[in-house]
């Protein structure tokens, strides 16, 4: 049985002091959480130092929102994997739609980051994929998403998939209040799992974690998580307040 991975993505919110305070509330709130649920928080780079002091030694994993595929050098504004590991980062989000849109990241760059991440001792790498509203309306959802999966995992060995989490995040549902119906999400998640089976094996497909991201909240999370191929959520706005994030966690772990 696959575990449920609930990751809060705090994006560009909170000072380091504010982030540490929210993280402390979450850590305290999940002290006795069901072992089948994995809780993750992803603050800004500038908050990692303070938040890691809160999450260290707890059952809450600490993540980063991006990283460079280079380990050092003339990469102004970027951050290296070793720098993240210094702050106890457990996982990194790669290929988020906002990075694709605002930072110009493409599949080739994202794949380089995946391959670099696998060379470092992160517990997990979250590879995000998803289609725009225009692509969905043209009936291209599966073509776009599965192509991103293939490109993102290029040259990744099956033995490394245990450290890869896939996150389907329809771009049109991120921060808009719109959410794919559980049936729409399940259709894509099932297709992704079948693609993993085609690329690797049935065992790999059965075991890989596939999160859903896109305006997840306490009202829709239970329905989404009830689908066969949805194994967790990458949560934005509803993870910014400890009480709303804890309500989501408690609803799934009850």
From Swiss-Prot:
It is found in: Cytoplasm. CDD domains: TIM. HAMAP family: TIM_B. It holds the Pfam family TIM. The gene is tpiA. This is Triosephosphate isomerase. It comes from Borrelia recurrentis (strain A1). SUPFAM superfamilies: Triosephosphate isomerase (TIM). PANTHER family: TRIOSEPHOSPHATE ISOMERASE (PTHR21139:SF42). Disulfide bonds: none annotated. GO terms for cellular component: cytosol. It comes from the Bacteria. Its EC number is 5.3.1.1. GO terms for molecular function: triose-phosphate isomerase activity. The keyword Oxidoreductase does not apply. Belongs to the triosephosphate isomerase family. The active site is at 96 (electrophile), 169 (proton acceptor). Keywords: Cytoplasm, Gluconeogenesis, Glycolysis, Isomerase. Homodimer. Involved in the gluconeogenesis. Catalyzes stereospecifically the conversion of dihydroxyacetone phosphate (DHAP) to D-glyceraldehyde-3-phosphate (G3P). Substrate binds at residues 9-11, 175, 215, 236-237. Pathway: Carbohydrate biosynthesis; gluconeogenesis; Carbohydrate degradation; glycolysis; D-glyceraldehyde 3-phosphate from glycerone phosphate: step 1/1.
